[in-house]
């Protein structure tokens, strides 16, 4: 598929960060109420930006992580439409019908001390944990669930495990 496919969907990249033991990094969305407030890093692609460059940039901005090795990526765009409540808020939809995403899988090769939820001025997450890839579709907002199911299917060969929540410094 090309950039012209799904022209009403904002180009976006998503990142699944795998611990060396196969667990995945999950971030709890800052200021979003449970139960659907855990997700992977993701974000928009700048005009003319290479997709993998965008994925590495988003990962660094949202988590502080730069010590990674590429494991794989999804083929083509995976799309989702915004639900009516998002479409009704121009701040969130910004004229787009939804998002089209390419997902990247990386192995984390750094130390956990590298993870910094305040690496960028725009905080996306207020806590993080290692979890199981197969649990992620149940943790995400329902309108993104199909995307996460596709990502699980694409990257399941890299996965297994679970771990406790780690919060930003000063958070309970």
From Swiss-Prot:
GO biological process: nucleoside phosphate metabolic process; ribose phosphate metabolic process
Domain Nudix hydrolase: 8-153
Cofactor(s) of this protein: a divalent metal cation
E.C. numbers: 3.6.1.-
Function summary: Accelerates the degradation of transcripts by removing pyrophosphate from the 5'-end of triphosphorylated RNA, leading to a more labile monophosphorylated state that can stimulate subsequent ribonuclease cleavage.
NCBIfam families in alphabetical order: PRK00714.1-5
Name recorded for this polypeptide: RNA pyrophosphohydrolase
Recorded name of the encoding gene: rppH
């Amino acid at each position: 598929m090309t950039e012209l496919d799904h022209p009403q969907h904002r180009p976006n990249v998503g990142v699944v960060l795998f611990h060396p033991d196969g667990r995945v990094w999950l971030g709890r969305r800052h200021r979003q109420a449970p139960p659907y407030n855990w997700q992977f890093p993701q974000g928009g692609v700048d005009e003319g930006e290479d997709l993998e460059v965008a994925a590495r940039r988003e990962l660094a901005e949202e988590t502080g992580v730069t010590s990674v090795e590429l494991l794989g990526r999804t083929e083509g765009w995976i799309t989702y439409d915004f639900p009516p409540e998002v479409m009704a808020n121009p701040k969130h939809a910004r004229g787009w019908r939804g998002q089209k995403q390419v997902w990247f899988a990386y192995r984390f090769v750094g130390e956990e001390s590298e993870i910094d939820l305040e690496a960028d001025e725009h905080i996306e997450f207020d806590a993080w944990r290692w979890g199981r890839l197969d649990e992620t579709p149940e943790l995400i907002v329902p309108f993104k669930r199909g995307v996460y199911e596709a990502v699980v299917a694409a990257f399941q060969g890299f996965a297994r495990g679970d771990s406790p929540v780690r919060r930003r410094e000063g958070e309970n």
